[in-house]
Amino acid sequence: MSRVTLSRYLIEQTRSNNTPADLRFLIEVVARACKEISHHVSKGALGGVLGSMGTENVQGEVQKKLDVISNDILLEANEWGGHLAGMASEEMDNAYQIPGKYPKGAYLLVFDPLDGSSNIDVNVSVGTIFSVLRCPNQYLSQNESLNEEAFLQPGTEQVAAGYAIYGPQTMLILTLGNGVKGFTLDRELGSFVLTHENIRVPETTAEFAINMSNQRHWEAPVQRYVGELLAGETGPLKKNYNMRWIASMVADVHRILTRGGLFMYPRDAREPSKPGKLRLMYEANPMSFIIEQAGGASTNGYDRILDIKPESLHQRVSVILGSKEEVERVTAYHKE
């Protein structure tokens, strides 16, 4: 039986599920950009791409060289194809306007070009996260300037989301709203090949991922829940749990998709004015869409993440996602 490449899968989706051709082309362009980013990541010190730029992004985070390289690759790959009305990135203060010399399309692309980049210098898996939205009609005119407001749509409006993980293998995880597929990069063929046809998150789990060094700063519901996990068989949950923490959202979520678990990056008392650390638009929303499509759940502790109406492009949010039973338990603790 012949292998199914990403291109073939997308063409079949166009035929069977009426996936628009423009969306198919857009996903293929993003995938090609991810292949180029994978090449730079794999070169590491040999390519002179490790270390910091000496600058900060809009989040106040020090930019790694590969942050900037990856951001530029995604912009240059996607600006000219005629599929997009604009882009937004973790690494840019404002929305990116499609240059006037190129046609505008019907979609918006939002991305974290290199999630987990603080781990680059120690050779830990990192990745690219992306989300696709429809552009509101009022911004579709070639002469209409795009602003931040066009992007401020709840996660339920996403038409596609995915991530590439650059690890021992480079994989692309994708949802078009009808389940989750996994593609592995065949470097000899030069294509992403379908290797995981129906990714599902088990409803129950015995693993969780959280940064325990922040425990003293957590709110009471998270303190209670994690305390019960650590109590194991002798606690109220009557089960032993293992903790895993990579400090790369892509890597931690990928593990959960592969074998189940719970990922938590809750709000804490260090910065009371901020509702969390992770960004809603280009981290929490696409990952929540993927997790839900795989049968899991995602919450900020009180509300479904995909229902949150963004107020700003770089809005932060508390994130708890993964196996449905555990997400529901944490949510119940927050609401007591």
Swiss-Prot record:
Q: Residue span of the signal peptide, if any?
A: none
Q: Where in the cell is it found?
A: Cytoplasm
Residues reported in the UniProt entry to bind substrate: D115, G116, S117, S118, N211, K277
| Binding sites annotated in the UniProt record for Mg(2+) 2 | D112, D115, E283
**Which InterPro entries does the UniProt record give?**
FBPase_C_dom (IPR044015), FBPase_class-1 (IPR000146), FBPase_N (IPR033391), FBPtase (IPR028343)
State the top-level EC class.
hydrolase
Keyword Magnesium attached: yes
| Pathway assigned to this chain's UniProt record | Carbohydrate biosynthesis; gluconeogenesis
Q: What is its main location?
A: cytoplasm
What GO cellular component entries does it have? cytosol
Q: Where are the transmembrane segments?
A: none
One GO term in the molecular function aspect is: magnesium ion binding
Keyword flag Magnesium: yes
Gene3D superfamilies per UniProt: 3.40.190.80, Fructose-1,6-Bisphosphatase, subunit A, domain 1
- Summarize the subunit comment: Homotetramer.
Q: Family, per the entry? A: Belongs to the FBPase class 1 family.
Name of the protein described by the UniProt record: Fructose-1,6-bisphosphatase class 1
